């Protein structure tokens, strides 16, 4: 059996930076209680290891309000502005491990909304990154994930301006399709493609590998937006695409008759 491993397999820059930030805080502040607001990344194995080292995951804003000491680390996906404001008001020390590319979107959304733009976020409304982005809007914001939602989108006034941004891990081709639908409405619109270049390149590489192999294995956490999209992309190119999280999930019987296998791992 011939195996082809994606060259860019593994954590992206923003995820690796966030993981390193947590371990650095553990090492440098061993006497302090370390918290992360939400799972620092979508990787169950990494989260378990951090918990063994004493890191506690805070899952709600109500829990966060009870924290009076220690260090809170903001997850790689970012948080709404109100969370940063809450930490400042309570005098809680925190470290912002938001991916720099996501942080850039926060700045864009805050600035454009203050200048009167209606913000359109193309992405998954259930994903913490999108929730965080929406939380930096100073005015109206709409999340669009499907073609139906794009067609249904309407401004209250035609004099409104629109600024479109995207979840960094959104499928690039879907983004283009949704932007085209919104653009047909002839609004005063600016479109900022904020999909991470690394995401786009990894999606293209995964698709190219999947096209030329007999079976494709996508490795990653089931909650990871990147992994879900890579599985979808690979499945479109290779019918025998498998989604696993650990080695124990791999059924070798499914691969006995194949000659070439592609492997793509991703986390976010």
Residue ranges of model-derived segments:
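Active-site loop-to-helix "anion-binding N-cap" substructures in soluble metabolic enzymes
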Residues: 2-138, 142-157, 172, 177-183, ...
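A short glycine-rich beta-strand->turn/loop micro-motif centered on a GG-aromatic cluster
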Residues: 60-61, 98, 123, 190-193, ...
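Alpha-helix C-terminal capping/helix-to-coil transition sites in glycosyltransferase folds
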Residues: 68-69, 211-212, 257
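A general structural motif
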Residues: 143-148, 168-175, 193-204, 222-223, ...
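Active-site rim loops that border cofactor/substrate pockets in soluble metabolic enzymes
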Residues: 182-215, 220-221, 228-243
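Phosphate-binding loop/pocket of nucleotide- and phosphate-handling active sites
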Residues: 261-263
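Conserved small/polar residues in nucleotide/adenosyl-binding loops
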Residues: 267-268
